[in-house]
Amino acid sequence: MDIVASRTVADQWRELARTCPDHTFLVHEDLDGRTRELTYGQVADQVVRTANLFHDLGVRRGDAVALHLGNTPEMVQCLFGLTVLGAVAVPLHPRVGAQECRDVLERVRASVVVAEPATAGMYDRGGATGGVRVDRVVVAGTGEPGGFEDLRDRRGAEPVFDEEPTSDDPATIVFTSGSTARPKGVVVTHANLLFSGIFVGWQASLRPEDRLLTTMPACHVNFQL
């Protein structure tokens, strides 16, 4: 039995946002102990605005965008925003160095990076510093003008794009650790993510009222399930 059919992550996300907008979607505690609790409805609004931001930056269906972020709500917004747009998320561990970042960006041909302040400095937008070359770096987590949150909130809450991904389209490319060889990019489709999520939910007997605690890094495939 095909339990995914032609559905995509975008389809699943929109259905959840429509049917349970007031349910808690995410509870996040940052390194300073501050806690944010966001509903499906709140995150759905941010996801569309994020997708519109990427579209305005020239990202289109099938394009790769690197996410050099830790475990933050902004990382989740970017992951879903890219899947809604039909683009491909390429998550990078916050501790990954410049050489590996350069290698990954060249291989996936990413021209846009969303980074946090601790990682943004390794990227070179003008060719003057010898850092990792990229067309555009958006810095998240500062709340400052021109940062991710500001640019996101200045976008509308209605989609400005009309292309839809298919279930066979890549949703993310996750790179292996490289412990035995050069890191390999593993292409994960919308169908792969949906099936894995359904299977894990069944295996763990998850119910709608349950809460799932994860300490996995957001760049890890297990986090994205």
Question: What spans do the regions from the language model cover?
Answer:
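Conserved ATP-dependent adenylate/AMP-binding module captured primarily in the ANL superfamily
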Residues: 94-126, 196-213
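ANL superfamily adenylate-forming
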Residues: 30-32, 36, 120-167
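Conserved pre-ATP/AMP-binding loop-to-beta segment of ANL
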Residues: 21-24, 156-175, 181-182, 205-211
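Conserved AMP-binding loop of ANL adenylate-forming enzymes
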Residues: 67, 204-225
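Conserved AMP-binding/adenylate-forming core of the ANL superfamily
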Residues: 22, 26-72, 76-80, 97-102, ...
